[in-house]
Amino acid sequence: MLWSIVRTRPLLRRRLYRLPFAADQRATLVNVKLKWVKDRALDSVVARERHLRQVHRLLELISTDPRGGVPIQELLIRPLHLGNLRVLPSDFLLRFPALFRRSSAISSGRSSPRIFLTDDAFQLRELELSVLRDSEPELVDRLRRLLMLAANFSLPLQTVDQLSWDMGLPSDYHKKILQCYPHFFGLVRPDDDERVWLKLSAWDPLLAVSELQRSSSAGGFNGNSLSFPVRFTRGFGLRRKCMLWLQEWQTLPYTSPYADPSDLDPRTDVSEKRIVGVFHELLHLTLGKKTERSNLSNLRKPLRLPYKFTKVFERHPGIFYLSQKLGVQTVVLREAYGGGRELLRKHPLVSIRERYAAMMNTGRPEICRRHLISEESEVVSSEVCYKN
């Protein structure tokens, strides 16, 4: 194998073996001209989750209230931010009659309106909690692998919070996971940083195998020049120069995202392949194999990436797709969808979230439904030259 694990104190750390390609790197990063082409299938994957996270947050709040329902007056002080709009939760929830219902209770001799879950929503929430309990060991391993990608096996807790929804972690994972697994996780505050960091307490070499290595090994290939699955949007025309470059780039040595990259020259295609590998692995750690680009913006130092590292998303449109839906850029791993709108391998939590999304569209006034599924203005495809 390219990488070996060696023991240090108090943890195990990674060390790069000096192979011929590592000693003879050249600044070979090629300027290529690529164009962004709209992928309607993957855009629909992003668009169908409009407002899902906000709805789920309020659903959790109501389901955990010991009174069974939350008084509307309490919701009035918690405005939601939906893009550029600030919406009162009570008004927002009543858009989804299949999930929420309004009822009045007598309190202190007067009527007090409250928001409750519908019976169907309550049953689905109970099923979700059951799946979360069953999936807990796997979710713990996902979080451990995320930290193993980072230098010193630690990330700012705020960064983990931003990724927690995409990774399927429960909203109270600080309590349900971090406190319940002290032998894996610890909170630290570095001397030169005011932020709280989440640190992995123990390195596990069994987890330090990337998804690409697993799939390649299952296919009978055990070399070090692993190729990424590539799939382009229908109608995407790859110029000959770009095609030749991509073919050569795929044959370059593959650097595990869990390995120490300090000996790699950031000006080389070998280093760029390592960056692609890091985000390929990170997206595989998410449930939907996607995340907002903004969630990755503060990962440069922890993941030991060069400046302008996110340009790999534009340079490799056959591996990643940048969706512009919902007013944000979302990075989607193409291979996970196989050219369609559905994940090839679907986690049970994804299926539950899809049922929530379907219930959000049930029983709504037609004008609201049309507004929910209306597409944003088309973004014109353009050719852009990405320079080193």
What annotation goes with each model-predicted range?
Residues L2-N388:
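Long amphipathic alpha-helical repeat/alpha-solenoid cores
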